[in-house]
């Protein structure tokens, strides 16, 4: 935590975000976006003009800022102008750039096997298995509690995930077995005194009563990927992409995959159709059909003669 004084403008913006129940990560992102704009202006953002916004957007375009990060900054500024300052004229000047539609990276089944085989510990293997076996986001994995594991119904409950939505995912026998192994060896000294159902599956070793961080999960994932010889750019989220893609290649209904991933729109899930290489490679090319020898079809007259039966 910093000791930086909170200005009245920032305090009002924080209150506006809390009133709309924006998650903590979104709030931090919006504040950082406005701080960046203020640093560019060298004065408070509530004094900004249309020309200031135009110059700032040109500045971002000329610097090494990705389209994704640039759009995040614009989202924060739009909230400031539209909600906190009620300056709709300035909010309209803030625009987003369409991001290139890139295919999500996916690991092959063989790469997944290698990744899990070289996991340096049972904890790492369980963490990675939750990503691939259940399609969970990194933030969902680290925030799992005992109460979320429903052995009676063979499901894992994901509470208040992205978009503040709850959902259920499958709990396979293999995954349940791994979780049982982990629970037997999991250190309990980090959450002594906490009711059993409220205990984190992966507690922090540094902060009592807190879960491990996504940064720690990311480090464990990359250590395993390097040991497995996986060179392409992958992250823990690649496990989720691979989960969806491999289910599609097993002919799992797209609607079911949408529910498991927690996507609001089916179109979001449908993008995995573009990376399901097993489905794509199974489609016969029309070029192959051209190369196949044609079977000679009998002429109509001959066919008719064959069909005529001799008189009894």
Residue ranges and their predicted role:
Residues 1-312:
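Conserved catalytic core of the tyrosine transesterase superfamily
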């Amino acid at each position: 935590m910093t000791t930086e004084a909170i200005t009245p403008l920032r305090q009002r913006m924080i209150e506006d975000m809390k009133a709309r129940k924006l998650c903590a990560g979104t709030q931090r992102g919006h504040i950082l976006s406005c701080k960046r704009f203020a640093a560019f202006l060298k004065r408070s953002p509530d004094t900004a003009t249309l020309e200031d916004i135009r110059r700032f957007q040109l500045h971002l375009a000329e610097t090494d800022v990705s389209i994704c990060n640039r759009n995040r900054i614009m989202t924060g500024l739009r909230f400031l102008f539209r909600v906190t300052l009620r300056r709709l004229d300035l909010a309209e000047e803030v625009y987003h750039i369409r991001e290139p539609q890139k295919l999500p990276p996916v690991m092959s089944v063989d790469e997944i096997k290698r990744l899990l085989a070289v996991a340096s510990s049972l904890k790492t293997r369980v963490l990675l298995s939750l990503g691939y076996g259940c399609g969970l986001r990194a933030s969902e994995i680290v925030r799992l509690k005992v109460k979320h594991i429903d052995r009676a119904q063979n499901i894992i409950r994901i509470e208040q995930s992205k978009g503040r939505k709850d959902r259920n995912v499958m709990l396979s026998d293999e995954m349940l077995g791994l979780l049982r192994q982990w629970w037997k060896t999991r250190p309990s000294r980090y959450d002594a005194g906490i009711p059993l159902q409220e205990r984190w599956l992966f507690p922090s070793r540094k902060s009592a009563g807190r879960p491990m961080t996504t940064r720690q999960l990311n480090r464990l994932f990359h250590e395993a990927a390097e040991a497995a010889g996986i060179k392409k750019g992958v992250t823990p989220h690649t496990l989720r992409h691979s989960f969806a893609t491999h289910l599609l290649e097993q002919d799992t209904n797209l609607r079911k995959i949408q529910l498991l991933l927690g996507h609001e729109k089916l179109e979001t899930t449908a993008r995995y159709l573009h990376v399901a290489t097993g489905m794509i490679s199974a489609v016969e090319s029309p070029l192959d059909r051209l190369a196949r020898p044609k079977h000679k079809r009998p002429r109509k007259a001959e066919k008719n003669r064959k069909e005529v039966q001799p008189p009894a």
